[in-house]
Amino acid sequence: MYQVDSEDANFLFMEKAESPTHISLVYLYDQSDLGDDPVRFTHIREHIGNRLNSAPVFYQKVQRTPADIDYPYWVDDKKFDLDFHVRHLALPKPGDWRQFCIQVSRLHSRPLDMSRPLWELYVIEGLDKVEGFPRDSFALYFKVHHCAMDEFTAQELLQSLHSQLANTRQHESSSQHIAHLPSNAPAPLEMVLRGVLNNSVRTLRLMLQSASNMRTLSKIVTRLSIRMAQDAVEGEQSGDSSNRFSQPLSAARVFEGTFYPRQLIDDYAQLVPGATTTHAMLAICGEAMRLYLEKHGELGEVPLRALLEVNVRNAGAHALVGNRIAINQV
């Protein structure tokens, strides 16, 4: 049986109406070199339809257990409808960057349908006045639930869909994995019995681990308590640190972006020995955030912190399902 593991299931159980846990990727395409034979929506739909076996996420949905007694199962969607998942829309005139960002914001604000495979792909046409792109450019907006994959896997999957080859490395690895996936979930009674057994095993394993690591756990709890007390005191001394990013969440999301030459990012990274392009992008985003808060008079004295997902897969590893990430605070 292929069951959602604990790390992936967390993204399901944490989801709320105001904080959905899906992720998305945006790709922009310049098709001016194609002349009188541009890419059409029907071509993209057919191309994706022929590659649904590249990963189980495309045709499997999540089946939750009664009362969430256990982690959910991945099961085949017997009513799979490609037209529900691959959609087509166009920007209103004049089709500029602002309208594109508004459209992406609306799409990302909508939760995924949990009764279907947890992904959607939008072909967005009408990008006629986006600086740096010619008329008739288009974009792909790909949205997938975080319980199915992280952004690194999503990027690899979407890139594999661009291949004209039927047997890429990604296709080969995923086809081997698909052979072991169930087509149906267990019956409700069986799911309950499995849940009781699995929870008993997990509890026993946790007790054994806790017994062998009690001294280490005690030290961790002590240090954590001290740190929390220090943070509380520092927070009181520093005064009100609230800004527009520390307010209660709503379901609405805002997307914005800009373009930088890759060489500029590489040159920026070389200014600090050992720095990578990721470090350079973090520095750019951090400075942009500082300037934004400063403009609105909300910079404050308390540093703004964010969480950064880091890919922890081994080099060369391919996994078109699940999450293999660590969370760093920056």
Predicted regions and their residues:
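Generic start-of-chain signal for non-secretory N-termini
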Residues: 1-23
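Soluble acyl-CoA-dependent acyltransferase catalytic core bearing the H(X)4D motif
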Residues: 1-7, 26-36, 46-53, 60-330
